[in-house]
From Swiss-Prot:
Assigned keywords, A-Z: Glycoprotein, Repeat, Signal
Transmembrane stretches, start-end: none
Glycosylation sites: 78, 105, 293
Record gene name: HRD3B
One family name in Pfam for this protein: Sel1
Annotated InterPro entries: HRD3, Sel1-like, TPR-like_helical_dom_sf
Biological source species: Arabidopsis thaliana (Mouse-ear cress)
GO BP term, example: ERAD pathway
Stated family: Belongs to the sel-1 family.
Protein name (database record): ERAD-associated E3 ubiquitin-protein ligase component HRD3B
Amino acid sequence: MRVSGQSIIAISLFTLSLYIHRVQARPFVLVLSNEDLNGGFNDNGAYESSDFDEFGESEPKSEEELDPGSWRRIFETNESTVHASASPQYYSGLHKILSAASEGNTTLMEEAVSEIDSSASSGDPHAQSVMGFVYGIGMMRETSRSKSILHHHFAAAGGNMQSKMALAFRYLRQNMYDKAVELYAELAETAVNSFLISKDSPMAEPVRIHIGTEENKDALRKSRGEEDEDFQILEYQAEKGNSVAMHKIGLFYYFGLRGLRRDHAKALYWFSKAEFNGLGYLYVKGYGVDKRNYTKAREYFEMAANNEDPSGHYNLGVLYLKGTGVKKDVRHATKYFFVAANAGQPKAFYQLAKMFHTGVGLTKNLEMATTFYKLVAERGPWSSLSRWALEAYLKGDVGKAFILYSRMSELGYEVAQSNAAWIVDKYGERSMCMGVYGFCTDKERHDRAHSLWWRASEQGNEHAALLIGDAYYYGRGTERDFVRAAEAYMYAKSQSNAQAMFNLGYMHEHGEGLPFDLHLAKRYYDQALQSDTAAKLPVTLALASVWVRRNYADTALVQVLNSLPEVHQKVVEWVENGMLEEVVLDPVGANVAQPLAAPVAFPQ
């Protein structure tokens, strides 16, 4: 069968929906036991295969149906979609909120919030969603958790998807998985449907704008298209036969990404070399060929899988789950889905979430189902907020970036939580943080940053917990509290943060917030060195201090050590410089927060 160049590009763009929208999340390792597999429904006739998705087919829906009240209309003036469900007053107020944040205009912000409040009182669910945000952060209104939840409930009942995200995240934080899983399941389904009509760049991923306490200059350079070294590496991989790299190179040329000029001829060249999976799709659906041929489809999917294309693994999983052209085998399907999920294929996460949710193929586990649904839901149309926030930040519009990241924080995005917290810490008054009566007071800024860092730490951001501990230890924005500092360091230590281990050792050595215990101090210092060899110098000095205290207690030498409180600050700086939060480099060169593609331990 000959496939035209136009068809190949169409296949490639279609497979985008199955392949290139990689799920971004905090690093995690999933270990499956035989109990996970054997506890589920493995009787191949005991479930309705129609309940599970097929090969990317979905009923076409408009963006208004998928994300009613979308903020896109504010940022893209050529938006053709008419948002009939949202009132003009809502969009007017929303536009003023963003303008006020950019300009640092508290008068305009008060006017904007009043306008949104009026629209919400008239029953507009999208205005109610914004008021939920307003009460949640205390912007021109007194902070009220109850009013925030109430507004989000009304908004969600009216169809606002962002409020459903906010409520789902609240339920998740309270371990109310029975409620969270239902909302995230709906949101994930919407996200999957949106992949086919997404107007965003397929490579747009949440970018962490900071590394530790410093700006993430490498990531920002790449976001501006100023770095091409990683592209050269990717091109080299493509030339060596890596089909995943071929597909990405094709997308770069087709969309003109990463500073490249659009070149459809080059895009076609790379797509035609990579699209085994797309050809398999044509055969399984019978598009452009004489008739459906499941044997041929399976052969192409297997070739795609052999070329490390996660969509090939995903579609093989669908064949076995559905029993299409092969004997139905849910256990075999599960294995393929896990391989695809480890490669970042979002629909594979969606299928696995359904399996954990329903108990088909895997032991029913609402916590795991919720986690996987959330990963997919965060790739929905509302994820465009991240791109607009980054664009604002790159243009120097810190106020707009801060309010957009703050909105995303409420929806449960960890990267947005840490970005917003970092902005308010780094820029202070220049963050344009708006409080109850105008610009945020020092206390309001501290409380806002503390809340954001804490949420990020709950989702696995170890540096966030460390910063909370530092704030309490040094009295930054709050009164010094060694006990709370120790609690925060303990939390960061539980996430294997070496600097937190070092700090706990210091606190035990000096009896600050923790019992004076040189044995425990040495243990924590040793753990810090085991976790990160970059800590060798500060740990060596700290261990020397412990040795002196143990062998020369009540001597002048110990008194000299105690008279040098500034030594700890210097040591902390050394440790911090050597233990900055790790950043995962995607082969594409997008310095983004993303899964480490940790291997799944699958029982044989």
